[in-house]
């Protein structure tokens, strides 16, 4: 069995292979703890994300499986890449990815961003989204803390745990409130890749202003703040609301006029204002796409249609509609991990995490 080393991080057991050393906490979210470490095989810094109790519920099992499937298949310069994955003897799952020094949230709280950085960061976000959306995938939880940046200003989108195949009947209350598209709040269904463009528009506005554009205290307040800028939703948008209660609520609100963006924003850059306005269209059907946004004049310094690739094929995530028991998700997860390491499921030998040679791994300790 592979050699595992125990460490306590914020009172949480980190049980990793001896391939990784020098663990330091980076951040903690609702579904996992992230540490930085050194990969002794490559001498490179990495990020190790522990998925806590991935098999505690079918919902969490599916979420973890979904994120693994995405990270395995998405290969793009502006999307975080998976370099290793293993399951510890205690059946926690660890994703190992490249380490970037900071995230956009930390940058925005530290200092105002200059125009060239705003342009470059926005360009990279949209470049990544063009690829993801071309595969029929919606991220669903874009926010500054999910946008990683290194010292060279290279940017990568991370945290695909909530991502889904584009589905005209997609449901659920998902993204962080400040960056949540109005169609999610209004209908909870019938939304698509346009929700990511809204979130990116909110991030773009935050880079321009230095603070969140729509800092709602709850979903009602969030919607109210949005209408203070964009005005009352058009009638054809209101008519798409499926919930009768939500429809009555929206129709009961006083009519609000739209505020010109040049009165709301500090920037006097007309190209920036034009692009953010196109990204924050109330109607997702008229919202600009990632591909269209990349070609906008505001991003002309970086736009290169020959270097903005799309996915070779759509992802087949038919499992997303499956209601499976935990044990089935576990078997599927093990299969994906074996496939990631290019090892036949029929074999009992697995590469040692510490270098050349093979060792037999237990059912709960897959690694390389």
UniProtKB/Swiss-Prot annotation:
PROSITE patterns membership: MAPK (PS01351), PROTEIN_KINASE_ATP (PS00107), PROTEIN_KINASE_DOM (PS50011), PROTEIN_KINASE_ST (PS00108)
Regulation: Activated by tyrosine and threonine phosphorylation.
Location within or outside the cell: Cytoplasm; Nucleus
Motif TXY location, chain numbering: 171-173
Listed cofactors: Mg(2+)
PANTHER family: MITOGEN-ACTIVATED PROTEIN KINASE (PTHR24055)
Annotated domain remarks: The TXY motif contains the threonine and tyrosine residues whose phosphorylation activates the MAP kinases.
Protein name (Swiss-Prot/TrEMBL): Mitogen-activated protein kinase HOG1B
Organism, scientific name: Wallemia ichthyophaga (strain EXF-994 / CBS 113033)
Classification lineage: Eukaryota, Fungi, Dikarya, Basidiomycota, Wallemiomycotina
């Amino acid at each position: 069995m592979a050699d595992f080393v125990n460490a306590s991080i914020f009172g949480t057991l980190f049980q990793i292979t001896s391939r990784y050393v020098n663990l330091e906490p980076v951040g903690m979210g609702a579904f996992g703890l992230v540490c930085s470490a050194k990969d002794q095989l490559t001498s490179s810094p990495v990020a190790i994300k522990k998925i806590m109790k991935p098999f505690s519920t079918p919902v969490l099992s599916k979420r973890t499986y979904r994120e693994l499937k995405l990270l395995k298949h998405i290969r793009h310069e502006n999307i975080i890449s998976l370099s290793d994955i293993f399951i510890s003897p205690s059946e926690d799952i660890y994703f190992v990815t490249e380490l970037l020094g900071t995230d956009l949230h930390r940058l925005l709280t530290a200092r105002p961003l200059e125009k060239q950085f705003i342009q470059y960061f926005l360009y990279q976000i949209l470049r990544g989204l063009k690829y993801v959306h071309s595969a029929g995938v919606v991220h669903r939880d874009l926010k500054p803390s999910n946008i990683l940046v290194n010292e060279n200003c290279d940017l990568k989108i991370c945290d695909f745990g909530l991502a889904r195949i584009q589905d005209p009947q997609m449901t659920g209350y998902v993204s962080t409130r400040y960056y949540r598209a109005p169609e999610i709040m209004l209908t909870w269904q019938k939304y698509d890749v346009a929700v990511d463009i809204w979130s990116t528009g909110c991030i773009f506005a935050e880079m321009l202003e230095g603070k969140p554009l729509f800092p709602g205290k709850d979903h009602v307040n969030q919607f109210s703040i949005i209408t203070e800028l964009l005005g009352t939703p058009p009638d054809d948008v209101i008519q798409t609301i499926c919930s009768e209660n939500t429809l009555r609520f929206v129709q009961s609100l006083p009519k609000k006029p739209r505020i010109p963006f040049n009165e709301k924003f500090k920037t006097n850059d007309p190209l920036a204002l034009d692009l953010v306005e196109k990204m924050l269209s109330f109607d997702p059907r008229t919202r600009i796409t990632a591909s269209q946004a990349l070609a906008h004049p505001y991003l002309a310094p970086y736009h290169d249609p020959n270097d903005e690739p799309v996915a070779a094929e759509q992802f087949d995530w038919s499992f997303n509609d499956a209601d499976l028991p935990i044990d089935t998700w576990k078997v599927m997860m093990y299969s994906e991990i074996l496939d990631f390491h290019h090892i036949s499921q029929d074999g009992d030998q697995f590469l040692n995490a510490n270098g050349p040679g093979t060792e037999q791994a237990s059912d709960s300790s897959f690694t390389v």
